[in-house]
Amino acid sequence: MENNKTTLRVSFAAIDPYIETYIVSPTEKSQNGRGWVEWGERNGYADYLLELSKQAPTLRAVINGTVDFIVGDDITIAQLPDTSYIPGVMNTRGDTIISQVESIARDLETYGGFALQIIRNALGKIVEVYYCDVHFLRSNKDNTVFYYSENWTSGKRKIVEYPAFIHISPEKWASLSDEEKERNYNSILYVKREHTQTYPLPVYCAAVKECEIERCIADYHLNAINNGFTSSLIVNFNNGVPTDEVREEIEKDFNEKFSGHQNAGRIMFSWNDNKDAATTITEPKVEDFGDRYKALSSHVRQQIFTAFRANPNLFGIPTESLGFSQEEYESAFKLYNRTAIRPAQRLIIETYEKLYGQPGVISITPFSLQAETEKTVQ
């Protein structure tokens, strides 16, 4: 008895692609022949943190809010000696101490550290201070030499080398050789919260996965709007299977006209030899999906706030409680101010005191809830 076998060819198009997220770990690796230590795989950890801070809503809210708290209501600093800048101006470009502290505070919260570029005059006196974007910097193992590039992930990059900043008295500067002076005219002051490795770690490093989950949730909903994670329409062609070229052309025409976010879904195509061979789709259903999604969103947000030791209400993110009184807000702010804001302000103040070589050159007026209850940080 002869068995008649029919080969059924079915082609599907426009099925949504799998979105792969790549979490970069803060590994450190020295390369032979290179002076710097790589910061993450393919030198991409800083870039990864920057993108994460832009795309994870809760993380961005906490960073932005914390920066506002650190900068406070006002910042004053003594005039740089031997300069004609107006008070509060830090360089010939006109950067103010407030804008500079805002930038380094953002780096401190995003990466766990910050950097300043220090310019000296011929006598060795500091005459200019610039904010230096820490994510463009790489360093040797002990942070004595720094390398600046605006594209560390590319093979073709321009790299500028700088020495680490050291405080040198005018007397000692005069005793330096011309070569040593030339090397130290332009230097980098590199500041880290932790000193356990070459590069800093952000306070939320233990919650990076939660930040990534939150970003993926946003991507999920965007893709659901754009083209649907499950197709909203199946088109069966039951008059045989055409050539690959014909199928691709028909599928392309259909997708261009009918699919996308304006048509609330994507189209799935099925090519069949006859109607009896039409494609059958079984859609898996998840019970209580809404409750699971809500629980997941709540969990990841809480983990991010836990990493910062912060109360969500401080950043305009409501909790499940029925309310948040002024008294509770003030209490939460005072705790966060004590455990996170003032230590960051102290680190910044100590950095500028190191530059000037004396204490008391800079003060930060705290972010005011009730101004009379707060004292100036000096």
Where do the language-model regions lie?
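Leucine-centric amphipathic alpha-helical interface motifs
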Residues: 1-48, 165, 298, 321-378
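Structured, contiguous alpha/beta core segments that scaffold functional sites
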Residues: 2-67, 71-272, 377
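A contiguous, surface-oriented mixed alpha/beta subdomain in the mid-to-C-terminal portion of proteins
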Residues: 193-351, 361-366
